[in-house]
Amino acid sequence: MATLTTTQTSPSLLGGVVIIGGTIIGAGMFSLPVVMSGAWFFWSMAALIFTWFCMLHSGLMILEANLNYRIGSSFDTITKDLLGKGWNVVNGISIAFVLYILTYAYISASGSILHHTFAEMSLNVPARAAGFGFALLVAFVVWLSTKAVSRMTAIVLGAKVITFFLTFGSLLGHVQPATLFNVAESNASYAPYLLMTLPFCLASFGYHGNVPSLMKYYGKDPKTIVKCLVYGTLMALALYTIWLLATMGNIPRPEFIGIAEKGGNIDVLVQALSGVLNSRSLDLLLVVFSNFAVASSFLGVTLGLFDYLADLFGFDDSAVGRLKTALLTFAPPVVGGLLFPNGFLYAIGYAGLAATIWAAIVPALLARASRKRFGSPKFRVWGGKPMIALILVFGVGNALVHILSSFNLLPVYQ
């Protein structure tokens, strides 16, 4: 397995776009209609667009700092050098927590949707066993190489996009304006539930662990990597918009309360959509799409965790070194998935809390420190100090929202 560095033939732009897009657009999107049902469609779209803007720029700030270090340097190296040991420990804990808990969430989600898929074929496969088997398959692909993940993600994302448009093209045809505009509730309030959506929005635009992986893939080519981040995140925003239209235009707002009470996992939402549409072919497409959605996100997130742990522990890129990294990457979340198979919605929410440190606060601090030391000779994010301040406020604000929510100090749609 060769280390990926800049070569005479540069990898295609599409490979990087699908790594970013595939990481973002995955199982996390299934939580959005459930947690956004209180704020409903238009307020939720405002939250998504604002979050997309902030998360894109925080990723660009990571790139700005990363370009001043050797290819293969991950957050551990960069944060320790620019911000010191204290911030490095805090950042390291938040990275490990986010990536581990997202890996656990996708094991939970894969077990749930595979159990539902096998049930459609009259096969009884327990969710725990299905999630465990799927995790082993993903572990093998990640162990092979970054290029293997890129190629597999490209295949899965391609299949996911095809099934997405087949499924949601049909779903959009069933959208009821009265349902989307929530005509049935004449005195409904939406704005009070807006803050609750922000940590989930943040978790649904998580790709930051893959920025160092892209530098490994393309070398120090900021122009190409910036395009990967912009196109990948825009792809996610577009598909989230279609997803919210398709779900909130078909499932009445009050029905989401029952979906949330059942844990909000993928199979519950798929069953709710199937019940509304009463279409066997659409039901099958939904199930197929759900499987591809989990697979692409699972691959991207675990690649980020894999590269971070390899850098942290100094494991080399040999078969044995990658095996050690793979064991550290997958063993803890697999155990969690076997013990607690239904924690998807809770895991996504807590990932949003920890991700505020790693995906918003620390990137802004890295950009500021990098400019002071290096002057950002290769690439600089536009906006100057005000942009850094905005990303910091965004991160701290998200953390406060989640803490207030944990103590039941924010209104909940129920």
Curated annotation (Swiss-Prot):
Cytoplasmic side: 1-15, 63-88, 150-151, 215-228, 307-325, 368-386
Catalytic activity: L-tryptophan(in) + H(+)(in) = L-tryptophan(out) + H(+)(out)
Periplasmic side: 37-41, 110-128, 173-193, 250-285, 408-414
Membrane topology (UniProt): Multi-pass membrane protein
Keyword Ribonucleoprotein: no
GO MF entry, a single one: transmembrane transporter activity
Cystines in this chain: none
Cited NCBIfam families: araaP, PRK10483.1
Family named by the database record: Belongs to the amino acid/polyamine transporter 2 family. Mtr/TnaB/TyrP permease subfamily.
Protein name: Tryptophan-specific transport protein
Organism: Escherichia coli (strain K12)
